[in-house]
Amino acid sequence: MTDSSNEHETENPSVPNPDNEIQDLQQEIATLKAELKEKNDKYLMVLAESENARKRMQKERQEMMQYAVENALIDFLVPIESMEKALGFASQMSDEVKNWALGFNMILQQFKQVFEEKGIVEYSSVGQKFNPFLHEAVETEETTKVPEGIIVEEFAKGYKIGDRPIRVAKVKVAKSPAPQEKEEEKK
């Protein structure tokens, strides 16, 4: 009867085979693990993209604030330079005007301090090699006293924040004299 009962078990499909059931469950576990890994990878990717977007937006917001400050301060450059020029003549004026000039000079220094705090610095150009990124050549001067391309005069100061100019210097640049032709060759 044991033989017939064993045959009966293998022949009866309604009774589950434990080995097949374990295999099916292991297959289902493997499939679920793969799906979980895929979903987790997607989640981590979306999380990283979200963090990158947040950082990018924060950086853009800081840059916009910096540009707004720069633009506001740039508007003060011309009046400040005018004040510097006017104060340059104070030594030729009366004592009363000199006292006023002293006060205006203090105000001018406060403006310059604000510029420095915001990272805006003026740069010197005379004696430097012409750099189109930092300078605007408004004049050239033929000379043999300095090499070609060297700045010989500055008409307006240049200002920058870090390495980025916010206003280029207006300058006069040295130029080699044109070769002079002999009068004989002209005839």
Curated annotation (Swiss-Prot):
GO biological process, one term: protein folding
Region (Disordered): 1-23
Entry-linked PROSITE patterns: GRPE
Record-linked CDD domains: GrpE
Record keywords: Chaperone, Cytoplasm, Stress response
The organism's place on the tree of life at top rank: Bacteria
Primary site of residence: cytoplasm
Biased amino acid composition, Basic and acidic residues: 1-11
Record GO terms (molecular function): adenyl-nucleotide exchange factor activity; protein homodimerization activity; protein-folding chaperone binding; unfolded protein binding
InterPro entries reported for this sequence: GrpE, GrpE_coiled_coil, GrpE_head
One GO cellular component term noted in the UniProt record for this chain: cytoplasm
Localization annotation: Cytoplasm
Subunit structure: Homodimer.
Family: Belongs to the GrpE family.
HAMAP family: GrpE (MF_01151)
Function: Participates actively in the response to hyperosmotic and heat shock by preventing the aggregation of stress-denatured proteins, in association with DnaK and GrpE. It is the nucleotide exchange factor for DnaK and may function as a thermosensor. Unfolded proteins bind initially to DnaJ; upon interaction with the DnaJ-bound protein, DnaK hydrolyzes its bound ATP, resulting in the formation of a stable complex. GrpE releases ADP from DnaK; ATP binding to DnaK triggers the release of the substrate protein, thus completing the reaction cycle.
Protein name: Protein GrpE
Lineage: Bacteria, Pseudomonadati, Chlamydiota, Chlamydiia, Chlamydiales
Gene assigned in the entry: grpE
